[in-house]
Amino acid sequence: MSDSHLTAFDKASKAGFIIALGIVYGDIGTSPLYTMQSLVENQGGVNQVSESFILGSISLIIWTLTLITTIKYVLIALKADNHHEGGIFSLFTLVRKMSPWLIVPAMIGGATLLSDGALTPAVTVTSAIEGLKAVPGLSHIYQNQTNVIITTLVILIVLFGIQRFGTGFIGKIFGPVMFIWFSFLGVSGFFNMLGHLEIFKAINPYYALHLLFSPENHRGIFILGSIFLATTGAEALYSDLGHVGRGNIYVSWPFVKMCIVLSYCGQAAWILANKHSGIELNPFFASVPSQLRVYLVSLATLAAIIASQALISGSFTLVSEAMRLKIFPLFRVTYPGANLGQLYIPVINWILFAVTSCTVLAFRTSAHMEAAYGLAITITMLMTTILLKYYLIKKGTRPILAHLVMAFFALVEFIFFLASAIKFMHGGYAVVILALAIVFVMFIWHAGTRIVFKYVKSLNLNDYKEQIKQLRDDVCFDLYQTNVVYLSNRMQDHMIDRSILYSILDKRPKRAQVYWFVNVQVTDEPYTAKYKVDMMGTDYMVRVNLYLGFRMPQTVPRYLRTIVQDLMESGRLPKQEQEYTITPGRDVGDFRFVLIEERVSNARQLSNFERFIMQTKASIKHVTASPMRWFGLQYSEVTLEVVPLILSDVLKLPIKELVPVEDSEA
């Protein structure tokens, strides 16, 4: 990687600063909407809190943001970039060669990130709309929670509905809106604090530790379940690394942290000033003058939509990476924008919409949603910590130091996990069930692939080279196609899937001028696009290894077109001049892609567990995208063939011929 690229990645700019605000900080930036409300309501209301409770709560928030977000993610995780890309799957590709079991924390972390993230639009948008209860002139309408739910659902329908068209046209305003949002958080919090400067004492971690064991804290250690809401968006700082660059996050995070800490302190000051008033409004909205609340609700709604959009886009990216790493079923992916990073996965979009909408309808209020929110993300953070430990060791950190540092973060996050475990009975079970379902699908897909590689026979292509040449020259067979292309799962040392040779020679002899055997390998680098060619000493058999990054689309025909041109220009492949064509000088013949669907024909060798995995994977494949779409073959000539996936030698069944009686008497 060149120094200029590294400099650009680490360099900050004014434009990058604004862009980072709109992409990275939506989730963590909207946490002030509901974190203090959750703390106060779980304590019994505004009139049940004391100064020591408030100081302890703010101290816990400050030090949680410092330890987890600043130290772990900003100072440590951001250095673990995979060619400028971040996120749990990028981190996994950096360390997966160190141990085969690391696929487990990667799958669990990805699944919990997806499942818990499905609650983010529900919590943030509902919290913002509930602010209308504090707006004079509208409060009488929105005191009825049904109206809040209806408004929230309308916003969600529009938000998820526009995903298919791409969001680049509105993405340009995200940064400026979030800059205004964070500026408002900081300014309003600062002015609210002026009457209660004792809030600054919360910087001392003594107040945080004291509150955990204080009798004034009605929830004990379980208060950390509400505190954790302040840092649920920390994972996004790492996941969105590739979108904005490390330098812009380094510069923007201090500004963001200052603004949200000031907001929490301002809400705390308002609570101390009104703890005997009996007001039961969300401190975030109640701490602002009533004449400004309608503008604040509008701004909060925009911020909530931006946070939700970041979550949706992040989910598409996460699933896309999992598919290319072959740990998730293939779903149709489209690119509605000009940028390859702007992708859209219809199935995932509408699953997220269904989960989010059901969450709003089932929990109804943001307070009830908060009770279930954050449980799964603690698991994601633990899984990231495990992978980070291996990364530090790989980069030369002394193992004892890497173990100690990551053990500290694992302990902190495990305590948060235990504190959030109480949420399981308050709705967190729904998120856990969704996460388990995603992990199950990932496991089945990954394990099924391993079983195929374990049992399926492969053959040496060199042993059949002469047969293929005879077939190519045998005019008794009609020309099947000028170029026939097979996609192979394996092509090492001239070994190829048995099913491909079965298709060429046994299923129906396919005469062609050139036989192409293409293998797509996903690399650990995100944006690789390279290939290797082996002509096998012929001009009619071509082995192609495509090396594509885990964030690159696997549109095989587009790459193959370039490869064919390169081979013809170098003289390694004869030109295929066309007699009939509307394109003068066309020297490439027609192509047909043969896709092979392998079905288990004899599973005698499989254990019951392996048979269950293969059958389940086959069932899942019925609802996934076809390989034709995944490899970009929609506009190509494609033949789909079903061949037996022979896992063991087929046993002959005993049978006897019935001999006619008259013949036996003779």
UniProtKB/Swiss-Prot annotation:
Checking InterPro entries in the record gives: K+_transporter, K_trans_C, K_trans_N, Kup
Family (UniProt): Belongs to the HAK/KUP transporter (TC 2.A.72) family.
Q: Which UniProt keywords apply?
A: Cell membrane, Ion transport, Membrane, Potassium, Potassium transport, Symport, Transmembrane, Transmembrane helix, Transport
Q: Which organism is it from?
A: Streptococcus pyogenes serotype M12 (strain MGAS9429)
Q: Which GO terms describe its cellular component?
A: plasma membrane
Question: Where does this polypeptide localize?
Answer: Cell membrane
Q: How does it sit in the membrane?
A: Multi-pass membrane protein
Q: Is Magnesium among the key words of this record? A: no
Q: Which superkingdom, per the lineage? A: Bacteria
Role summary: Transport of potassium into the cell. Likely operates as a K(+):H(+) symporter.
Regions that span the bilayer: 16-36, 58-78, 100-120, 149-169, 173-193, 221-241, 253-273, 294-314, 343-363, 373-393, 399-419, 424-444
Which reaction does this chain catalyze?
K(+)(in) + H(+)(in) = K(+)(out) + H(+)(out)
Output this protein's name: Probable potassium transport system protein Kup
Among the GO molecular function terms of this UniProt record, one is: potassium ion transmembrane transporter activity
